[in-house]
From Swiss-Prot:
Keyword Disulfide bond appears in the UniProt entry: no
Record keywords, A-Z: Cytoplasm, Lipopolysaccharide biosynthesis, Nucleotidyltransferase, Transferase
Gene designation per UniProt: kdsB
Keyword Transferase included in the entry's annotation: yes
Gene Ontology biological process: CMP-keto-3-deoxy-D-manno-octulosonic acid biosynthetic process; lipopolysaccharide biosynthetic process
The protein, known as: 3-deoxy-manno-octulosonate cytidylyltransferase
PANTHER family: 3-DEOXY-MANNO-OCTULOSONATE CYTIDYLYLTRANSFERASE, 3-DEOXY-MANNO-OCTULOSONATE CYTIDYLYLTRANSFERASE, MITOCHONDRIAL
Reaction catalyzed: 3-deoxy-alpha-D-manno-oct-2-ulosonate + CTP = CMP-3-deoxy-beta-D-manno-octulosonate + diphosphate
Organism: Salmonella typhimurium (strain LT2 / SGSC1412 / ATCC 700720)
Origin superkingdom: Bacteria
Amino acid sequence: MSFVVIIPARFSSTRLPGKPLVDINGKPMIVHVLERARESGAERIIVATDHEDVARAVEAAGGEVCMTRADHQSGTERLAEVVEKCGFSDDTVIVNVQGDEPMIPAVIIRQVAENLAQRQVGMATLAVPIHSAEEAFNPNAVKVVLDAEGYALYFSRATIPWDRDRFAKSLETVGDTCLRHLGIYGYRAGFIRRYVSWQPSPLEHIEMLEQLRVLWYGEKIHVAVAKAVPGTGVDTADDLERVRAEMR
C-alpha cells in the first residue's frame, strides 16, 4: 500500500535544546528517525522543520525537507502546513512519526498506515498493554480506553479505567485492562485539513493532549495494539544517554 511519512522536527526544546540534532552514536537523532521511516516502505518521507540546520542534516542524509513556520502550537498543525505545501489529495494516507523516536520499529509505522487504510475513519493510532503500576500511575504515560470495536473512548494522563476493587486493596499491581497510547498517528490528508479548522477543545487544554480535539468534535480514532514496543523516546538529557547506550 502507498503512504507518506511526515516527521515533525521542531528545533527548540525547553528540556533539550536543538534536540533533532543531538548526536546518537555518530549521527543526528533526526537521521536515525529518517532511517527507521525508510525501513517501513513508505512511498515518500518528509521531514518538517523550522530550522535550517535540521534541514541541512536531513538533506546530507539524502532526505526530503519541507520548511515550516516556527509558531505552530502542535505537531498536527505543522503536518497541515506540509499537506498544503505538497498538495496531497484528501485520501492520501499520512503517518506522523515523532522526530524524537530514534528507536521506533519500522513495523509499527507501516502497521498504523495499514490500520487506517482498512477502515472508513480519518485517524488511527496504536497502544501497548501496561503491566507495571509505576507506568499506570505515571501522568507522562498517556492511557487510552477503547470501545468494543477498537475505537478510542478517551485518552487521559490519569489511570483509566480505574479498577475500583483492585485498587481499593492495593496500588502496587495492575490488571490487564490498561493501555498506554503511543505517539504515532495515521491520518487521511483531508482529515488533517478538517482537524486544524476546528477550535481547540477544553479537554485538550486540561490534559494537554491534542488528540482529544478529535473526540470532542464527535470523530473516531481507531486504536490497535502495536506489533512491537518502541524503545525509549528522547525528551531529556537522561533519555538521550539511555538511548545512546541502547543503540550501541
